[in-house]
A protein has these predicted regions:
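Short juxtamembrane and helix-loop transition motifs at transmembrane-helix boundaries
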Residues: 1, 25-31, 92-101, 120-128, ...
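Topogenic membrane-insertion module of multi-pass membrane proteins
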Residues: 1-47, 206, 213, 217, ...
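Interhelical loop and helix-boundary elements at the membrane-water interface
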Residues: 1-14, 50-69, 117-137, 177-193, ...
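Multi-pass membrane catalytic core of lipid/isoprenoid biosynthesis enzymes
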Residues: 6-10, 52-118
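Hydrophobic alpha-helical transmembrane segments of polytopic
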Residues: 9-12, 32-39, 105-112, 138, ...
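Helical transmembrane-bundle signal
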Residues: 13, 17-20, 75-78, 109, ...
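Helix-coil boundary and interhelical linker segments in multi-pass alpha-helical membrane proteins
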Residues: 19-34, 77-104, 145-162, 208-211
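C-terminal membrane-associated helical module and adjoining short loops/tails
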Residues: 127-233
Length: 233
C-alpha cells in the first residue's frame, strides 16, 4: 500500500490544479492562487515521500510531470491571461485596442512550462540542481503577484508590466541557468549551507512582508543561486 503514497500525493497536486482552473472560470483569482500554493505543497510531499520510502517508477515520473503541467503550466498561464484581460478594461492603454494582444502573453507560460518539463524528464543531471526555473517556483511567483499590491501598486496593476513578467518568466523556465534544488539528502550544515541560508531568508521575508514575501522569496532563490555560482568559480 505504501508504494502508492507518492502517486496519491501527485494526484492531489493535479486535483488542486483542476480546482484552481475552476476557480478562474468562476472569476475567483485569489482562491485559484491558493490552489496553486496547495499544489506546490503536494508536489514537494510526493517527492519527499518517494525519497523517504525509496520508491521510484516510470509511471510516477510521468504522472508527476502531467500534474505539474496542469498546476504549474496551464493554471498560471490562464491566471495571467484572465488577470491582464481584466486590467486592460480599466487602463488607458485599452482605449484604441492597440494592446489587446497583451493577455496572450500569459499563454507563453504554458508553452515554456511544457518545454521545461520535457527537458527535465530527459536530463538525468538535474538531481542536485536545476537547469532553468522550476515550474512550481514560477507558478508560485506568478500567482503571488497580487499580494505585492501594497508595495508596488502601479506595477501590479499594469497590464504591460505583467505581460513583460510572462515573457521573462517563460525565458527563465527554458534557460540553462543553474539553480539549486531544495532537496535534503541529510540535514548537515556542510552539505546544505545554501538550502539553510535560503530557508532563513524565506522565514525572515515572511515575517516582515507576510504573503507579499512569496514573490520576493522566489527572486531571492534565483539571486542566491546565481551568487553561489558566481563565487564558486
Amino acid at each position: 500500500m505504501h508504494r502508492h503514497i507518492p502517486n496519491f500525493l501527485t494526484c492531489c497536486n493535479l486535483v488542486c490544479g483542476c480546482l484552481g482552473i475552476v476557480a478562474l472560470i468562476e472569476g475567483k483569482e485569489i482562491p485559484s492562487a491558493y490552489f496553486v500554493w496547495a499544489a506546490c505543497i503536494f508536489d514537494f510531499l510526493d517527492g519527499f515521500a518517494a525519497r523517504l520510502l525509496k520508491i521510484s517508477s516510470p509511471i510516477g515520473k510521468e504522472l508527476d510531470s502531467l500534474a505539474d503541467m496542469v498546476s504549474f503550466g496551464v493554471l498560471p498561464a490562464l491566471w495571467m491571461y484572465t488577470t491582464i484581460s481584466a486590467l486592460l478594461k480599466y487602463t488607458i492603454i485599452s482605449v484604441d485596442g492597440t494592446f489587446a494582444f497583451l493577455p496572450y502573453a500569459g499563454l507563453l507560460i504554458a508553452v515554456a512550462s511544457a518545454l521545461r518539463l520535457a527537458i527535465f524528464n530527459l536530463d538525468e543531471t538535474q538531481s542536485d540542481s536545476f537547469k532553468g526555473l522550476p515550474t512550481p517556483a514560477n507558478a508560485l511567483f506568478i500567482t503571488a503577484i497580487p499580494f505585492l499590491d501594497a508595495l508596488f501598486f502601479d506595477f501590479v496593476h499594469s497590464p504591460l508590466a505583467l505581460a513583460i513578467i510572462c515573457v521573462v518568466s517563460s525565458l527563465l523556465l527554458v534557460s540553462r541557468i543553474d539553480l539549486f534544488a531544495l532537496k535534503f539528502k541529510n540535514f548537515s550544515w556542510s552539505d546544505n549551507k545554501i538550502r539553510f541560508t535560503f530557508l532563513l531568508i524565506a522565514v525572515l521575508l515572511l515575517a516582515v512582508f507576510r504573503l507579499a514575501a512569496l514573490p520576493l522569496i522566489i527572486l531571492s532563490y534565483i539571486a542566491l543561486s546565481l551568487g553561489v555560482r558566481m563565487f564558486s568559480k
